[in-house]
């Protein structure tokens, strides 16, 4: 066990409703890749700050790690705008790039050498993210948090950065916690998911197991058109974006029937057994329904 959360609550000021409330135990193990997912205001960054000891909380966080054994890429990382990137890097890390092979390796890996002579304010969004990632990776911490590491970047830059992160860590035992609202990033990087909604823990577990729990063995997705709604009216539906229809398939036989129906009627479709967006939507819906029922029982 690397870290254990046991009934955690965070409140800001005198607010009545907690910013974060986790009413069960959550365990992080060595080498895990944990994706933290939720809409804006769900409590993702608050959770990271609590785990880092940056905000007060009730409950318990148990770990043998020292504060210096945790590293974090937070959403807002600002440095002295007028200094060169090279000087900032060497000052914070207390090193000389020319004598630090690990730092040289990271600079080369992230193709960052052309940026060293620039002032920080002259860096693009993608370059600033790479700079901060290099600084975080230099700590080589057993537990590292990446909070919205690709926020504000264009698709191509985002994809490249995610692929570089995945490749760098693929053979390493560091535990990663990745906060992101981009589902495809979590499909690529995470093997476990921690789902938050309105400050509450919806669920936590293996990515594949959560998909099976909330979506079935597989799902078949097609456009939400009148023809398709009629064709699929007798099959079990899942919550999905308005422009799509998602059918849950509990067995291979069920899937064959759905697919056969669509092929016979010349309908394009997509099959998935790991769609995080669909899983997240259905997990959240089921959780909120259960919360609503619990609230009604308490009133009665």
Predicted regions and their residues:
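Conserved ABC ATPase signature
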Residues: 119-123
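Q-loop/switch helix immediately C-terminal to the Walker
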Residues: 76, 81-96
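Catalytic Walker B motif of ABC-type/P-loop ATPase nucleotide-binding domains
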Residues: 144-147
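A short, flexible loop at the N-terminus of ABC-type nucleotide-binding domains that lies
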Residues: 1-5, 9-24
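The feature captures the beta-strand-to-loop junction immediately N-terminal to the Walker
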Residues: 37-39
């Amino acid at each position: 066990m690397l870290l254990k959360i046991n009934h955690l609550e965070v409140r800001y000021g005198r607010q009545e409703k907690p910013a974060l409330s986790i009413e069960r135990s959550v365990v992080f193990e060595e080498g895990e890749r944990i994706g933290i997912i939720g809409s804006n205001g769900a409590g993702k960054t608050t959770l990271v700050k609590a785990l880092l000891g940056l905000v007060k909380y009730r409950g318990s966080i148990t770990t043998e790690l020292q504060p210096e054994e945790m590293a974090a890429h937070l959403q807002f990382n600002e440095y002295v705008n007028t200094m060169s990137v090279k000087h900032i890097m060497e000052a914070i890390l207390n090193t000389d790039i020319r004598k630090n092979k690990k730092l040289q390796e990271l600079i080369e890996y992230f193709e960052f050498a052309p940026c060293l002579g620039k002032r920080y304010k002259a860096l693009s969004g993608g370059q600033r993210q790479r700079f901060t990632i290099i600084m975080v990776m230099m700590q080589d911490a057993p537990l590292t948090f990446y909070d919205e590491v690709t926020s504000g970047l264009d698709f191509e830059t985002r994809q490249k950065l995610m692929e570089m992160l995945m490749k760098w860590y693929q053979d390493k035992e560091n535990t990663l916690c990745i906060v992101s609202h981009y589902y495809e990033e979590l499909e690529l990087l995470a093997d476990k998911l921690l789902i938050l909604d309105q400050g509450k823990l919806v669920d936590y577990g293996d990515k594949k197991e959560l998909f099976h729990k909330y979506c079935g063995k597989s799902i078949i997705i097609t456009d939400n058109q009148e023809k398709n709604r009629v064709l699929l009216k007798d099959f079990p539906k899942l919550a999905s974006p308005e422009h799509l229809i998602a059918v849950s398939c509990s067995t291979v036989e069920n899937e064959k029937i759905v697919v056969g129906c669509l092929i016979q009627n010349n309908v394009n479709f997509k099959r998935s057994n790991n769609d995080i967006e669909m899983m997240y939507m259905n997990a959240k819906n089921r959780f909120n329904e259960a919360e609503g029922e619990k609230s009604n029982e308490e009133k009665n």
